[in-house]
Amino acid sequence: MDEVSPTKHFTSKPLLPTKTPRDKAISHYVNALNSPRNVVKTETPECGIQIIDGDGNFASTDTRERPSLKNYILSKPEFLKRGMDYNAVGILGAQSSGKSTLLNYLFNTKFRILNEVMGRSRTTHGVWMALSGKESNIVVFDLEGTDGSAREDDYSFERKTSLFSLSVCSVLMVNLWSHDVGRFQASNMSLLKTVFELNLQLFVKEETPKTLIVFVIRDREADTPFDQIERDIMEDIMRIWDTVIPPEEFINSPINRFFDFQFTSLPHYEHFYENFVEEVNLMKKKFDPKNKDTYFLPQYNKEIPADGLSCFCEQIWETIKDNKDLDLPSQREMLSRYRCTEISNQIYKEFNDSIKGEMKILKKGNIIEDFKKVFTKQIDAALERYKEVTERYMETIVEEIEEQLKKQLCGLVESLFERQAELMEKAIGKRVKGEFTIIRNEYALLYNKKEFNPMKYQKYSQELSRTKAVIERDWRKQFDDSVPKFLAEKTKEKFNSVCKDIGIAYEDSVSKMTEVMKQHFGDYLESTIKPKITPYLEACKKDMWKNIRNVINIQFTNGFNKLEEGFKTCSNMNKDTIEEEIKKSKTDILNSIKELVIKRKIELPYLLERKFNNMFRFDNKGLPRKWEPTDDVDTLYFAARDETEDILDMYCYFRIEESDDQYKFTINYRDGDLPSESIETLPKGADEEKVILNHEERKELIETLNGFFEKGYLIALREKENSEIKYQIPLYLIVLVVFFGFDEFIAILTNPLLFILTLIIGGGVYIGYKLNLGGVAKNYIQYLLSMSLSSTMEYLRTIPFFTPLIDKVWPKDDNNTEETQEEIK
């Protein structure tokens, strides 16, 4: 690369240029500020008062033109009521740069603005103040512009007004033209240095609040990235801060201990007026204390009581006014600083241009090989060029700016490395996820619900460990080849973070495969246990839970030995963790069995009715019971009912442990007429999680069963009564029937037709008797007679003559037929 020539690249500008770009911008501003559109569109703008005149006199007394600051504040009762609940804002910047116009648009004030006829001269003299906001909660300070020709080289007044604004303002705006950024003199960077120094010496206490400095970049240019402007300004600020000699108690304090910085920009007022107004309205929201993004944060409030503001301002101004140590740096130092800064900026720009190729590579998402080697070489070359060009200037300034340039270059490389590290981290993360997923999927194929063999999972953890070690080795090599020496310490955390992520991914893969193995085992054990306990649930016997517990204990003993072996071979779990996981698996499987029992609640009424019928309505051979007069219906009924209700009580609770058999959820009144009842409260010592049928469900089911029991009991009693009738016919009645019916008997025997008819009817009666259908025949005959009589009466009811008579002897009864039908059924 060609040697950088100070003459070629860093030529000095004429002292009195005829037409600079800045003057052109000023001309635009003069036209803009005097445009009719520059009138603040508001009904009641706040004009404010001049609290410090151009000669430095404070407004401590009333004059014909204005009241004193004290009387002005006293005329604002709404402001006095606020106490310390208000904020103050001021603005610094070059003369005729549109500061007053900006304040007028932002805060509904009416500060005096530039008149084109008068040329670019001072519009704001000294310091003006106004109250803004619907509740007078904002104090606005408009300061005289800097670098004006009226004061020539007398910078003392500018510095004093700047220091004054810093002492009272929560927020201080610095108004800059975008084309002045990076120009030390035009952007008032030297003034900021003095402000910082004197602010520390005069005002900063341990408890003093911070000040927020907001840089407002005016006439924003589309081809200049705002982020770059922001970085340039912050770099200037940090360079200035590095040169500030603070008091001893703040020797190591960073600038953000005393100041915060924010940046915003606005388009050209004249050329882009609509955009300007729109963005100012957006900016205005930042000055609303109720907005969550407000500039007026509590930590910036100077906490000056409203009624003491005038006294405070006067004392502060007198303190600043009497200060005698406000001289500019020496001309030689200024020249050295300006030229070294200019050369540094040029070197930085060349460096930035030279690495655009690498920036494009990273922007496309590609990793730069040998990142450390490439950029270390370029930084060394840039610093060497800087030393060659600046060797004529003050050594201390050269070294100071060189250190700042080095920080800039390293900062730029650091930002690129952040992208490089991001891409490397993304690539290594993708690799980790891909390789671990492949291994996990291979072992997931071992799943077989009907079989569980823990030995198939044995090599999984070993393969994951080998893969993890290879990835960590590759990551360390790639990282070492990319990290420049000056970033070695800063990037340790990033390296360790990625290593930690690899470890987390490894543990996650082991955990996921462990979960797969647990799920495999659970499905296998459930598929083994459920078919074996289902018959016991359907049989509904008193030893149901005992048999279920036996099945579960046997399967658990055999199965969980396999699971424990699987945990030891597949994962790195310790003994306590394995025991905990086995306990969780047992709980999950028992919950699954409990769900199986709960699902059978729907079938429970049918199972209980079947149980009752098997004991009461069927004999030991499974045939329908034929009730004889000698049968003890009550004993059989109560025995069947009690056992059925015992089965119901067993289903009320998940009796997976032997101690669970002691809990009762129903009250059975043995051998009595009272129906069973559900116990409303949970038995002492019982676990609510094991309850299968709650109180309401038990109560409803008992009511259903009681109706079923009573119905079966009544049917049995009726059948028994019918069977007793055939044993109650007297012998003398049989003799009388034979004696008086002998002639009819002979007539039947001698008449073939009557004889055959008698045999048919008699055979039918005999069969009905043997089958115990007498009661059914009796009910059916009653039904036919009732239906015939009902039909006849209803027919006669339709005849007007018989209607009154029929209504008296045969009232309407719609339920009569239904009851008869139900009786027949």
UniProtKB/Swiss-Prot annotation:
Q: Does the keyword Transcription apply?
A: no
Record Pfam families: RHD3_GTPase (PF05879), Sey1_3HB (PF20428)
* Coiled-coil region: 373-397
Q: Name one GO molecular function term.
A: GTP binding
Enumerate the UniProt keywords alphabetically: Coiled coil, Endoplasmic reticulum, GTP-binding, Hydrolase, Membrane, Nucleotide-binding, Transmembrane, Transmembrane helix
Localization in the cell? Endoplasmic reticulum membrane
InterPro entries cross-referenced by the UniProt entry: G_GB1_RHD3_dom, P-loop_NTPase, RHD3/Sey1, Sey1/RHD3-like_3HB
Report how it sits in the membrane: Multi-pass membrane protein
Reading the lineage from the top rank, the first entry is Eukaryota
Q: Where is the GB1/RHD3-type G domain?
A: 83-305
TM region(s), chain numbering = 729-749, 753-773
| EC number(s) stated in the UniProt entry for this protein | 3.6.5.-
Main enzyme class: hydrolase
Q: What is its main location?
A: endoplasmic reticulum
* Record region (Disordered): 1-21
Instruction: Give the UniProt family note.
Output: Belongs to the TRAFAC class dynamin-like GTPase superfamily. GB1/RHD3 GTPase family. RHD3 subfamily.
- Please identify the protein, giving its name as recorded: Protein SEY1 homolog 2
Top-level taxonomy: Eukaryota, Amoebozoa, Evosea, Archamoebae, Mastigamoebida
